[in-house]
Amino acid sequence: MKKISILALYLLLILFSGCMRSVQLNERAIVQAVGLDWKDSEYALTMQIFDPEAAQGDDTSGGKMLRVTGKTISQAMRNANLKQGQEIFWGHTKLIIIGEQIAKDGIESVMAYFNADAQSRPNIDVLIADGEAGEVLSEPLDSTILPVLSTKMMLEGYQDNGKLVRSQLRGILGSLENPAVGAYLPMAAFS
């Protein structure tokens, strides 16, 4: 009986072990928002990365912008890891902005990439940029809070007032899988 209990305990301990390596918070680049564009036959990613030191001070940007390119989204992400020197973390991403050119060519591959990533959450808001997503994401906002949070609050306000219907990753994926339903996304433009 004692041997069975010890064996059961060992099996239980094996179940609690994870298959992913441990990454400390200071080794991660926490992406708050990402803009994807298609330029010169490659993807151009603009990422707003959270910077805790900037968030503690008077800097209302709360982060830094990282711009990378690649033939595929995966290659651009690998380039972002190399350029940033930290592991890119999607778990707290609140906003994806897709450039107008990618939207015209089809968003299926972009949505499939974020759906396949284990860190991406299904409730990420998705917008189409009127022009380039990197420009929309880089636009400074007159705000005392983080720009991505300000944009998210604007989306919620417009939805509450019936001015737009928010599109999130899970809803878009469902619409793309169903041939009887069309996906709809709000367009972001600054004037």
Model-derived segments and spans:
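Membrane-proximal alpha-helical signals and transmembrane carboxylates
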Residues: 2-191
